[in-house]
Amino acid sequence: MAPITFHLDVVSAEKRIFSGRVETFQVTGSEGELGIFHGHTPLLSAIKPGMVRIVKQHGHEEFIYVSGGMVEVQPGTATVLADTAIRGEDLDAAKAEEAKRRAEEKIQNQHGDMDFAQAASELAKAIAQLRVIELTKKRR
């Protein structure tokens, strides 16, 4: 028996990144990891920088980096509305490594709470991008 699917849209301010039927998807919500399957209770949550792991029909996976945003789950459909969303294969590993290095430098040379919070946020985003790149490469 085939798994039950539901519709998922992943959109950013610039464009729709993904639209289709999925078996499940995972995203990092404000309170931790969320695994969404068909029939999930309706939900609205903020999402943190990280990845959206999508399991499409027949078990095919796709990874998308999101810089934060919201996830909404309704009966039969879900939407990830991201500030920024980039497919794993479109991320630049060299740029992500450089962003990680710069953020680590800022943390080492901090001059107040605001500098630290900004640098920690930049570091989290760079690490999330590198993780999506790594998982996308493994999938191939």
From Swiss-Prot:
Q: Name one GO cellular component term.
A: proton-transporting ATP synthase complex
Query: What keywords appear on the UniProt entry?
Result: ATP synthesis, Cell inner membrane, Cell membrane, CF(1), Hydrogen ion transport, Ion transport, Membrane, Transport
Q: Which GO terms describe its molecular function?
A: ATP binding; proton-transporting ATP synthase activity, rotational mechanism
- GTP-binding as UniProt keyword: no
InterPro entries in alphabetical order: ATP_F1_dsu/esu_C_sf, ATP_synth_F1_dsu/esu, ATP_synth_F1_dsu/esu_N, ATP_synth_F1_esu_C, ATPsynth_dsu/esu_N
- CDD domains in the cross-refs: F1-ATPase_delta (cd12152)
Q: Any idea where this protein resides?
A: Cell inner membrane
Q: How does it sit in the membrane?
A: Peripheral membrane protein
Location, primary (coarse class): membrane
Asked if the Swiss-Prot or TrEMBL record annotates the protein with the keyword Transport, the reply is: yes
The UniProt similarity line reads: Belongs to the ATPase epsilon chain family.
Q: Which HAMAP family match?
A: ATP_synth_epsil_bac (MF_00530)
**Self-association and partners:** F-type ATPases have 2 components, CF(1) - the catalytic core - and CF(0) - the membrane proton channel. CF(1) has five subunits: alpha(3), beta(3), gamma(1), delta(1), epsilon(1). CF(0) has three main subunits: a, b and c.
Question: What the protein does?
Answer: Produces ATP from ADP in the presence of a proton gradient across the membrane.
Matching entries from PANTHER family are given as: ATP SYNTHASE DELTA/EPSILON CHAIN (PTHR13822), ATP SYNTHASE EPSILON CHAIN, CHLOROPLASTIC (PTHR13822:SF10)
> Would you tell me the protein name for this molecule?
ATP synthase epsilon chain
Q: Which organism is it from?
A: Vibrio parahaemolyticus serotype O3:K6 (strain RIMD 2210633)
Tell me what gene encodes this: atpC
